[in-house]
Amino acid sequence: FDKESFLKAYQFGLLHESNGQDVPKSRSWNRLYAKAYLQLGGLIVAPRVWYRLPENADTDDNPNIDDYLGYGDLELIYPWGAHTFKLLARHNMHFNPQSRGAVQFDWTFPLWDDGLFGYIQLYSGYGESLIDYDKRTDRIGIGFALSR
């Protein structure tokens, strides 16, 4: 990243997400999004907002997904030596009994010098998968990453 500018990059796009299942387990949604990458010292701050593209009410397989996944998220990325830490948080911004959100923490670390990384992920909240977006999930993941 260039130290001269606070805004390092931005993205605009169309995001399609689907679980690839057939009805009745089918879940999908389409969003237009905007994301900025800002650098504050060694910390990268990446807010993203989205607009869900409307679907036909008769065929919408998750009509209340916005109530669980909200309208945006915030990602914090902190590279530290050969390690990378990421925190992703989202909330539906309903500060009442319908309040829903999620937080995800990722840690990648080198295993060897050939580009293979260890990966640990902690997740708590709603929207971890499309089929169960409306169910709260608490999960720990351990694995390998080929890139980061």
Regions found by a protein language model. Give the residues of each.
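Short glycine/proline-rich, acidic loop/turn segments that cap or connect secondary-structure elements
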Residues: 113-116
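Outer-membrane beta-barrel "beta-signal"
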Residues: 137-148
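Generic recognition of flexible, low-complexity loop/linker segments
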Residues: 107, 129-130
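Outer-membrane pore/translocation modules
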Residues: 1-81, 89-91, 96-98, 118, ...
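Short, electropositive alpha-helical surface patch
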Residues: 100-111
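Beta-strand elements of well-folded, non-transmembrane domains
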Residues: 18-20, 111, 148
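Flexible, glycine-rich linker and terminal segments associated
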Residues: 121, 129, 146-148
